[in-house]
């Protein structure tokens, strides 16, 4: 999925839709300046590369903006992903009605979802409306935005696996992700998705609940498991960044581990003890 092509991703990730050229051209010509200048915005925040505008007061939400900036620093520290060279715009809406109205006005071809990450030839945009999942949605979509602001491409499964990893608060990422229990039970029933199976998923509509859970599991293994696994992920992302054909990450792990799937299962058996 190349970010030079217009696309969007959403928290309800059943589909991926290419924005028509007319919509992309509208955004480029009428511009983000017109979007940003609308009178509806009543609060404004800056955190790292993120510039946020909201049609409601952001008082009480300060912590999540600190977390968004922290995600960028963590991507640098853990994976060597360079800091974004572009700003990433966030637009927050108090209700679903104003959110849907905005999306239909500026992106009429895009189905309305609870949260959207939109990327065309310019900087990425994150659109979210206020709900009890606001902070989770922001962390998830902004992870996509950071990755695609720094890398020319990210494999779909890895893109989603990293977003699932970072969507929870920092203190919960290693041991308290909601995917953990479901992952353990799926392994007990032999429902492990190999990395090769995930790599074959090319469209968001192919990613169901099981695929997201398994994508997160592989990311957790590479972040918190054997150092050799993280080294392969770091080098994989470095090759993408440098324009070197990266091959499949599964092939890299197979050269490091005689049985990567068993290594994954063993990681989940021992890490939480």
Region locations from a protein language model:
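Juxtacatalytic substrate-recognition/specificity segment
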Residues: 38-155, 245-255
């Amino acid at each position: 999925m190349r970010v030079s092509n217009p696309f969007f991703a959403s928290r309800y990730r059943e589909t991926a839709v290419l924005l028509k050229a007319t919509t992309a051209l509208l955004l480029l010509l009428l511009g983000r300046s017109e979007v940003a200048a609308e009178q509806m915005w009543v609060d404004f925040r800056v955190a790292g590369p993120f510039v946020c505008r909201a049609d409601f007061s952001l008082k009480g939400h300060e912590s999540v903006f600190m977390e968004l900036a922290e995600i960028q620093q963590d991507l640098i520290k853990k994976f060597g992903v360079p800091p974004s060279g572009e700003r990433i715009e966030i637009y927050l809406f108090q209700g679903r009605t104003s959110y849907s109205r905005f999306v239909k006005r500026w992106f009429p071809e895009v189905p309305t979802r609870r949260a959207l990450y939109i990327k065309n030839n310019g900087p990425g945009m994150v659109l979210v409306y206020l709900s009890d999942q606001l902070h989770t949605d922001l962390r998830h979509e902004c992870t996509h935005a950071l990755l695609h602001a720094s890398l020319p491409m990210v494999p779909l499964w890895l893109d989603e696996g990293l977003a699932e990893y970072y969507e929870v608060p920092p203190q919960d990422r290693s041991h308290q992700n909601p995917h953990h229990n479901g992952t353990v039970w799926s392994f007990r029933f032999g429902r492990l998705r190999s990395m090769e199976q995930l790599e074959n998923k090319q469209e968001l509509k192919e990613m169901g609940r099981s695929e997201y859970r398994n994508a997160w599991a592989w990311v957790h293994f590479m972040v918190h498991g054997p150092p050799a696994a993280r080294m392969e992920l770091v080098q994989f992302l470095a090759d993408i960044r440098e324009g070197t054909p990266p091959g499949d990450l599964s092939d890299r792990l197979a050269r490091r581990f005689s049985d990567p799937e068993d290594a994954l299962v063993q990681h989940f058996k021992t890490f939480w003890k």
